[in-house]
Amino acid sequence: GDISTDIEQLGLQLSERFNDFCVEYGKDITLMFEPGKFLVSDAGVFLAKVNVVKQTTSTVFAHVGSGFNHFVRPMMYDSYHHITNISNPEGRYRYYSVVGYICETDTFGSNRRIAEISEEDVLCFHNAGAYCFSMASNYNSRYLPAEVMVHQGKDYLIRKRQTIQDILNNQEIITLS
């Protein structure tokens, strides 16, 4: 998962070094940061339902009803996102490889220690707030998922799940001679 940062301590240290640099450089400079990940990574989780649990000689696969088209960061950057089984949080821990429904490089996590997983369980991928919808695609004509906001214990649908009609709406029919 993401490593937490003491933003106040970091600010003090950077400020001191930056001010020294400006004196050395002989000019005041404006320094700006893009804090997107810091602000929103922890603000969202990604949930996916387990469709199949499959034991092989080398691992136990938990196949989820999603793929890199919804949450590409683990595949694109080989990033780690903690995964919990919210349907069975107190279950016995086992090791799983969590994979998606798209053939190519669709592995959310390999050899992860997760509370025992059964078909229909819901897995939670943590620190996903900055990486799902903004990086999602309609790869292989897959729909984009719904988005739900939870505020003070109440859930609100803030974006509907796509339909095939949503995908086709921007298509133009042309006649070729």
Question: What do the PLM-derived regions correspond to, one by one?
Answer:
Residues G1-F33:
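Acidic, glycine-rich loop-and-beta core segments that form the ion-binding/anion-interacting portion
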Residues D28-S177:
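Charged (often Lys/Glu-rich) extended helix/loop segments that serve as interaction or gating elements
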